[in-house]
Amino acid sequence: MAKRSSLTRRGVSPRAAARARRHMRVRKKVRGTPERPRLVVTRSLKHIVAQIVDDTKGHTLVSASTLEASIRGEEGRKTEKSHLVGKVLAERAKAAGITAVVFDRAGYRYHGRVAALANGAREGGLEF
């Protein structure tokens, strides 16, 4: 029998395991500081969540999601809502005094909803 990785166990698809490996590889290099916190994106089939995290303290400073009532009520496709999440996140970050972030795509491809969120955050005034 072939040896299994700790990430390829029953119930986890090979695609999800590969994404988790990519995310771990990126997290070794990407660190958020108080001056330049980490913007991490989490995606599901229906929703997207973005958080700005200070890794030195382990605290979430600002977050935005399509699960919020104000964004959930908006009309449009998932990609358009992701763009809106990026803009809302940028507004909240500016209010908290955050202007520059390190983008952590969490192993997802920089395409579609992830790219739309990043573009929305840039339009809102965040610097990557």
From Swiss-Prot:
Similarity annotation: Belongs to the universal ribosomal protein uL18 family.
BP terms from Gene Ontology: translation
Basic residues: compositionally biased ranges: 18-31
One MF annotation (Gene Ontology) recorded for this entry: 5S rRNA binding
NCBIfam families assigned to the protein according to its UniProt record, in alphabetical order: L18_bact
A GO cellular-component term linked to this record: cytosolic large ribosomal subunit
Protein's name according to its UniProt entry: Large ribosomal subunit protein uL18
Gene that specifies this protein: rplR
Entry keywords, A to Z: Ribonucleoprotein, Ribosomal protein, RNA-binding, rRNA-binding
HAMAP family registered for this protein in UniProt: Ribosomal_uL18_B (MF_01337_B)
Annotated region (Disordered), positions in chain: 1-36
Quaternary assembly: Part of the 50S ribosomal subunit; part of the 5S rRNA/L5/L18/L25 subcomplex. Contacts the 5S and 23S rRNAs.
